[in-house]
């Protein structure tokens, strides 16, 4: 950890260098995901491509960005589904994607062939996701009307459902005890999405497109239903 003179000027203190010094592994495996997220909402993020790929540690991207336009919930939902599409790290395009553009690589992230170490990307959307969520605060409404958009399994092939802060019960599909990590349940949302997702992985370029149509319709319908 970097320790500075407490009497020194504030501008000499670098929070990121003190608490998270950049190296290839942390940037390519962590910062790159933030870069991909920023890239969906802000302009000029492509100038930090070399940093996100771990090639230029000195050209650090900003800690936060100003979105080009007001960010709506659906934009955030979809940013959670990113696999670096349209970038040099696009996981649908390299040899690991196979014949059906599968944007997933099984762990570990790095592997060795003939003495050369190679790297698999770690995208925003990953196959090992247990659950994911987006919190929506609406300050003009009572606190009880806040919404937690909640989903299970892979974000790219599952949908988000609005759950109000005032909710007093849990539906059976999300309830504790309805299935487990090792026990399949046909009424568990996790297991149903997990099953669908695993089918999609076999013919990803074809099946995921159909899943996305249903996902978009559901989320857009729900967004209209919760408008205030």
Where are the regions that the model predicts?
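Core active-site phosphate/anionic-ligand binding loop and the adjoining beta-turn-alpha structural block
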Residues: 8-13, 19-21
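Conserved small/polar residues in nucleotide/adenosyl-binding loops
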Residues: 1-6
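Accessory, solvent-exposed terminal regions and/or long lumenal/extracellular loops of proteins
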Residues: 20, 27-29, 33-116, 122-124, ...
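Substrate-recognition/cap regions that form aromatic- and gly/pro-loop-enriched pockets
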Residues: 97, 101-227
